[in-house]
Amino acid sequence: KESPAKKFQRQHMDPDSSSSNSSNYCNLMMSRRNMTQGRCKPVNTFVHESLADVQAVCSQINVNCKNGQTNCYQSNSTMHITDCRQTGSSKYPNCAYKASQEQKHIIVACEGNPPVPVHFDASV
């Protein structure tokens, strides 16, 4: 079974490409990373930084998660990200997305020892 840390990497890590405004990027990546199976995942963020840099966020600024848990961490610096949002008119199985390219701080939930990101909470 996929571990929470591996799931985070599959859903959110794309260090090898730069952030993209192309809806093609989102349509391709959402499908390739298995987020359009059974349903369209409505919103997803890809982070275009090294895994080491994203894992390091777990020792940066401790903040509350949206759900009230206290194991979220905000990055010290901004990161290149692409937000993929499902378009209003698209329906499963033809999931369609629009992309927005951002440079923002990311907030992730971390677990484990050593702590690693297991959930993408927000970008600010």
Swiss-Prot record:
Pfam families (alphabetical): RnaseA
Disulfide bonds: C26-C84, C40-C95, C58-C110, C65-C72
SMART domains: RNAse_Pc (SM00092)
Residues carrying sugar: N21, N34, N76
Region (Disordered): 1-24
Active-site annotation: H12 (proton acceptor), H119 (proton donor)
Residues that bind substrate: K7, R10, K41, P42, V43, N44, T45, K66, R85
Subunit structure: Monomer. Interacts with and forms tight 1:1 complexes with RNH1. Dimerization of two such complexes may occur. Interaction with RNH1 inhibits this protein.
Function recorded in the entry: Endonuclease that catalyzes the cleavage of RNA on the 3' side of pyrimidine nucleotides. Acts on single-stranded and double-stranded RNA.
Record-given protein name: Ribonuclease pancreatic
Provenance organism: Sus scrofa
Species lineage: Eukaryota, Metazoa, Chordata, Craniata, Vertebrata
Gene: RNASE1
